[in-house]
Amino acid sequence: MLALRLYGANDIRLVDIPVPEINDDEILLKTQAAALCGTDIRMWKNGKDGVDADHPLTLGHEFAGVIEKVGKNVPFYQKGMRVTLQPNIGCGICDRCVDGKYHLCDDYRAFGINMDGAFAEYVKIPADAVIRGNLAVIPDNISPAEAAVVEPMSCAYNGFT
């Protein structure tokens, strides 16, 4: 599959990499739309700690897609469902996570930030993202492009509330 990967400051490449394998508790998502964020630009221009030629990172944390494959232990979600995601996955046990504020977790992981993101044909959705409710089903009247910007729109909305 094709993926846009960061290899360091000002070093971003479109490369062919294997489609991610999933386990029985994960989901494989086929990317339909992904938005470019200021964070992606900053990482491209400045690089990211831990990302280099030996440890590249697939960018993209604002995205939507269709479920391609579902692990046998995953409840509710089915192949063909259209979803978008909240990109931050908290540890699930700290006070912030218990309060539902995963984005404030000191040990959070995030698609396209410190784990492979959606500037690729496919994205692996790990079990903790499935369990913690990071996926949201897209209604039929919302396009993938519109769904991909739900996350940045929610950031703006939360800034006003």
Positions of PLM-derived features:
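Cytochrome P450 core scaffold surrounding the K-helix E-X-X-R motif
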Residues: T39-K45
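Well-ordered beta-strand positions in beta-sheet-rich domains
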Residues: L14-D16, Y122
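NAD(P)H dinucleotide-binding glycine-rich loop of Rossmann-like/cofactor-binding domains
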Residues: I93-T161
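Glycine-rich beta-strand-centered segment in the early N-terminal region that forms part
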Residues: P20-A34, K48-V98, A136-P139
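Short Gly/Pro-enriched turn/cap motifs at secondary-structure boundaries
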Residues: Y7, P18-V19, D54-G60, F111-G117, ...
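Short N-terminal binding/cap micro-motifs at the start of the first secondary-structure element
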Residues: N10-L14, G38-T39
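Short loop segments at secondary-structure junctions
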Residues: A9, E68-N73, A127-A129, N141
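Extreme N-terminal starter segment of soluble prokaryotic enzymes
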Residues: M1-L2
